[in-house]
Amino acid sequence: MNEFAPAKINLFLDVIRKREDGYHDLGTLFQTIDAGDTVSATLREDDKITLEYNVPQEYPKESDLVYKAALLMQDAYRVGKGVDLYLEKVMPLGAGLGGGSADAAATLRLLNRLWELNLPYEALEELAARLGADVPFLVRGGSAFAEGIGEKLTPIEPLQLKDDQHLLVVTPLDAVPTKDAYAGVPKSGPDRWEAYKAGFKSAGSSTPVTPIDFALENVFNSFEISVFPKHPLVE
């Protein structure tokens, strides 16, 4: 049994403030794309969970979000059976595409079917929130505004490219650790994010500009300011 794990991009991302708990409040427009990894699963009659990869990994399997997602679901719903998991990894690490989070979300969807739990999306999203800020969105994917640390989601009508519009995602061979990206990023406050949301919502209603037009014409990412000087290849 297989499950595709579509990655995501941020068509808009603004770092609003740093919180007292050390995390950052964001305003972002999430969009899944048609590229991603694939998670496969084979049912085990015992309760063991195994994980293998198509390429060598530099970290213990127990720290992988795929393994953590399987263990979390097994524990939360007292599943008596196990699973052999296989991750076909094609998305690059440290690229900001949410590859690991997408893999975790795909694992939850996959095991929901394999273990015949029949859980609604809402239950999967509750589990996903315990795995990482991006994971709840990637349970369903599509298009959504996200706030807080990324966990406060407002789904919107799915964005569709027009026939004459194309989106190319380029990932240079220069991984950027999350800690480095946040180190020098400016905190803008809420004004830019609120103005973006207002402009997006008015697109297609009070203006001839459609939502996808507005999104593509207003691509923005706060991390460019902190990342480009240290990672010129990304720029």
Positions of the model-derived regions?
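Alpha-helix initiation/capping motif
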Residues: 4, 19, 55, 59, ...
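A generic "alpha-helical surface" signal
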Residues: 27, 64, 102, 225-228, ...
